[in-house]
Amino acid sequence: MAVIESVYARQILDSRGNPTVEVVLDTDDGAQGLGLVPSGASTGEAEAWERRDGDKSVYQGKGVLNAVKAVNEEIAPKVIGMDASDQRALDETMIELDGTPNKGRLGANAILGVSLAALYASAESADQPLYRYIGGTNGHILPVPNMNIMNGGAHADFATDIQEYMISPYGFNTYSEALQAGVEVYHTLKNVLKKQGLNTGLGDEGGFAPKMKSNKDSLNYIMDAISAAGYEPGKQIGISLDVASSEFYNKETGKYHFEGDDREAGYMLDFYENLINEYPIVSIEDPFQEEGWDDWAAITAKLGDRLQFVGDDLLVTNPARLAKGIKLGAANSLLVKLNQIGTVTETLDAIELATKNGFTSMVSHRSGETPDTTISDLAVAKNTGQIKTGAPARGERIAKYNRLLEIEEELGSTAQYAGYSAFKACKKYIAE
């Protein structure tokens, strides 16, 4: 038992220079945990509430001093004296204290900071690395890194409609080999773009963000880069997309403003089908808007045996929305973001529910990140087999990739790379 002795929050900056919450939690046995809270750019409407101050004269309204105050003045007195290692009891206490369905009083950024800090303090108290503390001895699978090497959408001033173009290096024996391949493709892509006279400035997540004439142009350049780097598209490296379609969906018209025109859901489904016939795409995230349950069910039924459809804005790491998706057959993969739901406990519950019902899980960063590496340990602890944490650039992204290298080394001969098996719905490339 590690009794919480003190909890203190402060305002710090994330990778985009926006304020976020840091929580320091100390226990009676000398352990200390640090909780650093990420923040998204394209967010689902059903996500837990991120508390911002709204004072336009300070950080353009994005300050989090009220969330900090909530930790120091409301949450801290309530949790001091509790067992930090009883994560469920701690998280439920904060949820009850908040008293709203979406953490809309205290703020998910306040609650998550404490939840994460308690998790780290408990792991230190138990003298265990975080992945071992969460997953026990069963956590041993290193995830496929889905690397966002070209940015569009809300991450890059809408250089393209599609928000993320990722490479998924699954055709390798170890995580370190896969990471090397991904990095080499990333650097090769820079040269490919330069030769075309295109800008190689970076988006929020470290990917290149040139203006493109079409979404397919980005895919073609990535295919060229994979081959030029000496790898086989499909066989060794697949492509994953985050369409983030809620960002260009018009609620009033019920249409998607895509490639310069307003499109019906049926057009979008046909577009995706043609895309996966033309390119080695193994995963599509948010192909439809966050309340388009019927459209999600239709694409999953039609194409779900060929690739994974990942629910981000649709499911928001929320066990209740995930249960609805399972019931309707909408999506077959869960994107896991700790700050979407706001506690460690609810995040773990969502992963377990997904696994139990045959969904894959992809543990994810946010576009506004910190040096925190929780998601790396979480992916290994729960054997999710997939992680997405941006391009192999920018320190806050590299920290996650480096943490996985450390874990792989620590696990030694027991480490297993998820590889192609991570994408359960995809069969055609490995069979060829």
Swiss-Prot record:
Q: What class of enzyme is it?
A: lyase
Main location (coarse class):
cytoplasm
For this UniProt record, give its keywords in alphabetical order, as a comma-separated list: Cytoplasm, Glycolysis, Lyase, Magnesium, Metal-binding, Secreted
Kindly give the SUPFAM superfamilies that the UniProt entry links to this protein: Enolase C-terminal domain-like, Enolase N-terminal domain-like
For the keyword Ribosomal protein, the answer is no
CDD domains given in the database record: enolase
Q: Pfam families given for it? A: Enolase_C (PF00113), Enolase_N (PF03952)
Pathway listed for it?
Carbohydrate degradation; glycolysis; pyruvate from D-glyceraldehyde 3-phosphate: step 4/5
Reaction(s) catalysed (UniProt annotation): (2R)-2-phosphoglycerate = phosphoenolpyruvate + H2O
- The residues that hold Mg(2+) are D242, E285, D312
Q: Per UniProt, what is one GO molecular function of this protein? A: magnesium ion binding
Q: InterPro entries given for it? A: Enolase, Enolase-like_C_sf, Enolase-like_N, Enolase_C, Enolase_CS, Enolase_N
Which GO cellular component term is one of those annotated? phosphopyruvate hydratase complex
Q: Which residues form the active site?
A: E205, K337
| Chain's role | Catalyzes the reversible conversion of 2-phosphoglycerate (2-PG) into phosphoenolpyruvate (PEP). It is essential for the degradation of carbohydrates via glycolysis.
Indicate the family of this protein.
Belongs to the enolase family.
Official protein name in the record: Enolase
> What organism does the UniProt record list as the source?
Bifidobacterium adolescentis (strain ATCC 15703 / DSM 20083 / NCTC 11814 / E194a)
Name the gene behind this protein.
Answer: eno
